[in-house]
Amino acid sequence: MSADETDAKFHPLETDLQSDTAAATSTAAASRSPSLQEKPIEMPLDMGKAPSPRGEDQRVTNEEDLFLFNRLRASQNRVMDSLEPQQQSQYTSSSVSTMEPSADFTSFSAVTTLPPPPHQQQQQQQQQQQQQQLVVQAQYTQNQPNLQSDVLGTAIAEQPFYVNAKQYYRILKRRYARAKLEEKLRISRERKPYLHESRHKHAMRRPRGEGGRFLTAAEIKAMKSKKSGASDDPDDSHEDKKITTKIIQEQPHATSTAAAADKKT
């Protein structure tokens, strides 16, 4: 069932309910006395108990109000019975709402709310869609980096910086002083050739092996023992050298005497 057919079906029911309500209120107002119309009507919360005795007029007014309330409830039940189950839920939720009796009230009234027309529904849907689009755009802008600020920053950095002659001279002077200080610090940070002169001399006296590596104490001792040779006593080696030299010197004289003896024979 379309929305137009539903509205057309509900319209006569609502008009009947409004007419019943208007007739009941008019009869209740006509029956009241002029002296009691200005006073507010008070009704206890418990409808079953008898009201407190405040006069016969007050009792009659409360009975009329109760009769009006019961009549409104009966008309509402009659309308609900004439509808289908699906239409009853729609009608009770969106079209009819009744006010229950309270401690302080003047009269009973039924508040009927009609469903909004189609053009209002379309406007509400458009507003909801626009709100959703705005929320999505806000989230997108928060997640994305600020590209415009980056572009502006690069453009400002690329622009030339104009100065006068005095400012240019001071800029050059500061740059020269900064370069001089950095060079001085760089030289002071360089490693010296040696920590102290005594250590340098000691390193120069130490024996070195292959590749300029310093030899350990065990390596130095092994090298000295290899140089000394097979004999451990240096005196014996010196005497052996003397004996060998004497033998070499006497050999030419012995050969000459042996040759002379051969000639004589």
UniProtKB/Swiss-Prot annotation:
SMART domains: CBF. InterPro entries: CCAAT-binding_factor_CS, NFYA. It is found in: Nucleus. Changing R199L: Favors CCACC binding over CCAAT. One of its GO terms (biological process) is regulation of transcription by RNA polymerase II. Component of the CCAT-binding factor (CBF or HAP complex II), which consists of one copy each of HAP2, HAP3, HAP4 and HAP5. The assembly of the HAP2-HAP3-HAP5 heteromer (HAP complex I) occurs in a one-step pathway and its binding to DNA is a prerequisite for the association of HAP4. Belongs to the NFYA/HAP2 subunit family. This is Transcriptional activator HAP2. The gene is HAP2.
